[in-house]
Structures are given as structure tokens and as C-alpha cells.
Amino acid sequence: MKTTLIISTYNRPEALSVCLDSVRFQTVMPNEVIVGDDGSTSETKDLIESFKKDFPVPLIHLWQEDKGFRLAMMRNKSVAAATGDYIIEIDGDIFLHNKFVEDHKRLAKPGHYLRGTRVNLGQKLTEEICKSKVNRRIYPWTIGIQNRAETAIHSTPVSNFFADRYKKNVSSGLGCNMSFWRSDFLAINGYDEFLKAGEKKMMT
């Protein structure tokens, strides 16, 4: 199974740098990474070009003119350009656990999509990570976590327990952490580009 990691970004190069660095440490690499850029300035382009020099997999920068919030359109363009059979989608202000791609591939099943969650970090911890540019682990006891601590646990038995506990509350996709088959995405014509928000809910 060939995978494409799609990263959505808009004018947050400092966060994107940390995100791309976290891709380097994956236990299983995606076959390619596409940065879908909704109109960022040249600072983002320069950053991506610097990463291309020694990035472990092909790194592709797709850019569209800044005409307001057009994330759905950019994501559709990114999936259209992808060569992977399986798409993993995140936001550019996410930095990944080192088994992130491995987990998505392991759990992929025909006819299903995956919706993950995230650990929300406070402003101080976020700034520290962006400034240090050091890939680090986040634990349930890490100071600066703003949402449920269990989202920082990487353990299959524990994850299964909380998946059963919260599954009835999951009603839609989450663009910062979801994956799906490219063929399924194309079959439903992708995201609704007329929506300014909630396009993931309409798709799933």
C-alpha cells in the first residue's frame, strides 16, 4: 500500500518546520509528502525548499493564490496530485508521534476511514517547541496539555478502551488527523468547496 501524507498550511512556517521535522522520525515513512498551501507568503516556500535538500521522501509543495479561506479546494488539489492509494491528512501545526504513519497504515481497512484526535498544547509549550525545533514526546503528565490527558497515551490496549468509550460521540472527520482511501475520496467527489467550514463533516 502506497501512502501520501498531506499537510495543510497557511502562513505558519515556524509550526510547519516542527511538523516536517517530526516526519523525519517516523518508524514507517509515507511514500511522499504533499504540503497543501492555501496562499502563504514566500517564507513558507523557502522553508519547504530547504527541507527538500535532505528529506527522506519526495516533498511536494502545492500553492494556490490567497483569496481567502479555501482549505477545501486546496485539500482537493492535494489529493488529486497524490500518487498514494491511501491518504493521511494532517494540519501544518501538528507534530507527530513517531508511530503516527505506522498506526494509520496498520489500522487501514477497505471501505473505512480513520479519525484520530490530538493533544492540544498551551501557548507557552507551543512556543517552546517551535523555538527549540526539537522533536520531543508529549506525555499525559507533560505540563501544558490543555485537553484530556489520555490523548497523549500511545498504547494499543488503552487506545482501544478509549475508542470504545468515546466512539458514540464521533460524528465526523477531523482534518488534523484522519486517513482514507484515495479511491473512496474520488468516488464522492472530495470536499465541498463551497463550504467555508465543516467540509470534513459533509464528507464523512
Describe every region a protein language model picked out.
Residues K2-T4, E32:
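Cell-envelope/extracellular polymer assembly enzymes that use nucleotide-activated donors
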Residues R12-F25:
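Short, well-formed alpha-helical segments that are part of the catalytic scaffolds
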Residues S22, M29, D37-I48, G68, ...:
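A conserved acidic beta->alpha catalytic loop
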Residues E65-A82, K99:
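Glycine-rich, basic loop-to-helix element that forms the pyrophosphate-binding segment
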Residues I87:
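Short aromatic/hydrophobic "clamp" motif used to bind/position activated sugar donors
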Residues K99-P140:
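Conserved donor NDP-sugar-binding/catalytic core segment of glycosyltransferases
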Residues G122, V134-V170:
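Short, flexible, basic/aromatic active-site loop/helix in glycosyltransferases
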Residues S172-G173, N177-F180, D184-N189, L195-T204:
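A short, conserved alpha-helix in the catalytic core of glycosyltransferases
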